[in-house]
């Protein structure tokens, strides 16, 4: 499996500038409009998912916090905490975390017409609290998939310990709906034809360990927080 990296963002404004703070529990089918992140209290392993079809070719060359590159869109600050089930879910300091996702139009770098680009892909090493942070843009979507971010976690020595994906909460006032309605910021697809988590070919079996917490607004940008439980 490969790993990942990421590009830059622009801040955006539209009429739906409501603060989102989606922290209530999500059901296993992902149908709730709110969500909860994995916590260390239950120490349940995060679901393993496919890295494909667009994994990063050489993630070790993309060590960076700001992964936006030349991509524009609504800013999304991502904070991921890596917990080690093998150590009673203590933070896994030094874990290498690769992330990657599509741009606002559903395109991935390194593939198709973007083979010479590496936007929206990046790697960071977890600090003493098991945390990594990235600055990116709010992902768009493409046919057959709900909004998501790919993650590949390694130990500091390079052992692969988790390949997974991050799901986003859904609902009428969710960030997903607000962002995809923000044509002023270049999100032109809207929600017509969108694949929800419950019908997604990756998330349809449940998203309880993959659901992020997303808060913020169109004008100020959004923040995503999520915990991933792996076993070293």
Residue ranges with predicted function:
Residues 36-197, 203-204, 230-232:
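Beta-strand-dominated extracellular/periplasmic modules and repeats
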Residues 11, 17-18, 24-25, 65:
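Residue-level marker of intrinsically disordered, low-complexity segments enriched
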Residues 19-39, 112:
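Ser/Thr/Gly/Pro-rich low-complexity, disordered linker/stalk segments of secreted
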Residues 1-14:
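N-terminal export signals
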Residues 16-17, 47:
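Extracellular/secretory pathway and lumenal proteins
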Residues 209-232:
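C-terminal, well-folded lobe of enzymatic/effector domains
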């Amino acid at each position: 499996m490969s790993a990942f990296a990421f590009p830059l963002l622009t801040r955006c404004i539209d009429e739906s500038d409501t603060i989102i703070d989606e922290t209530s529990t999500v059901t296993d089918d992902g149908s709730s409009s709110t969500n909860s992140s994995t916590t260390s209290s239950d120490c349940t392993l995060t679901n393993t998912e496919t890295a494909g079809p667009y994994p990063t070719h050489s993630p070790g060359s993309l060590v960076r916090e700001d992964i936006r590159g030349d991509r524009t869109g609504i800013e999304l600050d991502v904070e991921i905490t890596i917990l080690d089930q093998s150590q009673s879910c203590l933070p896994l300091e030094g874990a290498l975390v690769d992330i990657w996702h599509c741009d606002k139009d559903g395109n991935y770098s390194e593939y198709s017409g973007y083979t010479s680009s590496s936007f929206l892909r990046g790697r960071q090493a977890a600090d003493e609290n098991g945390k990594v942070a990235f600055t990116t843009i709010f992902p768009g979507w493409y046919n057959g998939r709900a909004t998501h971010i790919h993650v590949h976690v390694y130990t500091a020595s390079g052992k692969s310990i988790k390949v997974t994906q991050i799901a986003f909460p859904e609902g009428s006032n969710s960030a997903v709906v607000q962002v995809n309605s923000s044509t002023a910021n270049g999100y032109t697809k809207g929600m017509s034809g969108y694949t929800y988590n419950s019908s997604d070919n990756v998330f349809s079996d449940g998203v309880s360990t993959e659901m992020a917490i997303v808060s913020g607004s169109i004008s100020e940008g959004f923040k995503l927080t999520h915990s991933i439980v792996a076993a070293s």
